[in-house]
């Protein structure tokens, strides 16, 4: 990143690295007044360069808000909507309960490798920017990280925890 893109990193944060790669790719596309398709093309290049689990929401000043999820779906990302004073409004979050708390309704999960861009006019654009691979969500989202009242990838966290407990109890009974 330092040699190829001439970017200086201020921290050891993986988020800073990922966002610098995105900024470099946007710059490479010469996206002064980037369209949704320019942003999706830049993001496709980011997906080719970056490995790992992530769900990112970033404000691109003067353009809009971009949210994207890793191709394996390791980290969750959802989009919600509500009617506002200026029309339909969108919100991106890692958990459905964040939408609930802010008065939004869950629209859908952002698919692994998909990007959602809401432009300054409030229009939502979405595109599959990386080929989705084998969907491998992080088990700790269901076991520990997520709130029990969340829904991730159409799965109730509460019900998933109950089912895991039932399966664990069955296993313990068999081993006795």
Task: Give the predicted meaning of each segment.
Residues 1-112, 117-176:
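Conserved short alpha-helical segments that host acidic/polar catalytic motifs at enzyme active sites
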